[in-house]
């Protein structure tokens, strides 16, 4: 048996993004009791992937919305990208986040 795990993110602007996570494979002939259901290491791996996908999409949406200047509504340029480390309940996640230039109206 093969199990596929897919996450679909729907952003506030209506855009949808689909992420394919690792799957789980189980033989149909189970030889021991721990071969039935989800194993602890499977659960940890899948939870880590879910957390990473959610964080990446959240950071992407925050940056996309922050690029629009709240005063003049022009789109601010991206200065560069930096790696950020976010500490979550389920561990640390590294994300690549844009640094934005100041708007000319400031």
Question: Which residues does each predicted region cover?
Answer:
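Short, conserved DNA-binding cores of transcription-related domains
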Residues: 1-104
